Swiss-Prot record:
Similarity-based family: Belongs to the peptidase S24 family.
Reaction catalysed by this enzyme: Hydrolysis of Ala-|-Gly bond in repressor LexA
Keywords attached to this entry: Autocatalytic cleavage, DNA damage, DNA repair, DNA replication, DNA-binding, Hydrolase, Repressor, SOS response, Transcription, Transcription regulation
InterPro entries cross-referenced by the UniProt entry: LexA, LexA-like, LexA/Signal_pep-like_sf, LexA_DNA-bd_dom, LexA_repressor, Peptidase_S24_LexA, Peptidase_S24_S26A/B/C, WH-like_DNA-bd_sf
CDD domains (alphabetical): S24_LexA-like
Protein name, per record: LexA repressor
Lineage, highest ranks first: Bacteria, Pseudomonadati, Pseudomonadota, Gammaproteobacteria, Vibrionales
EC primary class: hydrolase
Superkingdom assignment: Bacteria
Organism name: Vibrio atlanticus (strain LGP32) (Vibrio splendidus (strain Mel32))
An annotated Gene Ontology molecular function: DNA binding
Role this protein plays: Represses a number of genes involved in the response to DNA damage (SOS response), including recA and lexA. In the presence of single-stranded DNA, RecA interacts with LexA causing an autocatalytic cleavage which disrupts the DNA-binding part of LexA, leading to derepression of the SOS regulon and eventually DNA repair.
SUPFAM superfamilies: LexA/Signal peptidase, Winged helix' DNA-binding domain
Length: 206
């Protein structure tokens, strides 16, 4: 990575701390507010400079589409974190949730996987996501209806197919024995933790 100016280092450090604390990068508006920029456009210019210096990657079309390339390089050496039991109110990628790391190339999944989540139950078995599988997940909140997502409803984390209907979200199982989960956004909290991008079934070789 090329040397950063003091201001660029501030932006870089803010992005890194937000990912560590919240599990996701900040928006342009959040960067501008925290660092005293006049507008989100000013933050965008600093992000472009960081991208030119290969410190970060900007993912088009996503409000939080920022990936730290140095972190990616470290993660590729360490492997993908396997997330176990997620504590209520804690970011899914908080260190205490990581059971271990698997030596898997994140780039084998498209988009690139950021973590693995062990599947519990058979609610998604009809599309080949089985109990005990390791689900590869791309960390993002930018998802479309019909995609399989990792969602947190209040304090419960689940893997389901997403459907939005006004102020209601339906999380569909892929098993006729399971009814959809109805989430009333006016009274319940829903957050999207990521997009399912693949599975690993036979882990004996890892």
């Amino acid at each position: 990575m090329k040397p950063l100016t003091p201001r660029q280092q501030q932006v870089f450090d803010l992005i890194k701390s937000k990912i560590e604390d919240c599990g996701m990068p900040p928006t342009r508006a959040e960067i501008a507010r925290e660092l005293g920029f006049r507008s989100a456009n000013a933050a965008e210019e600093h992000l472009k400079a960081l991208a030119r210096k290969e410190a970060i990657e900007i993912i088009p079309g996503a409000s939080r589409g920022i990936r730290i390339l140095l972190e990616d390089a470290a993660n590729e050496e360490q492997g993908l974190p396997l997330i176990g039991q997620v504590a209520a109110g804690e970011p899914i990628l908080a260190q205490e949730h990581v059971e271990m790391h698997y030596q898997v190339d994140p780039g084998m999944f498209k988009p690139q996987a950021d973590f693995l989540l062990r599947v519990n139950g058979e609610s998604m078995k009809d599309i080949g996501i089985m109990d005990g599988d390791l689900l590869a997940v791309h960390k993002t909140q930018d998802v479309r209806d019909g995609q399989v997502v990792v969602a947190r409803v209040d304090d419960d984390v689940t893997v389901k197919r997403l459907e939005r209907k006004g102020s209601t979200v339906l999380l569909h199982a892929e098993n006729e024995e399971f009814s959809p989960i109805h989430v009333d956004l006016e009274s319940q909290h829903l957050s999207i933790e990521g997009l399912a991008v693949g599975i690993i079934r036979n882990t004996d070789w890892m």
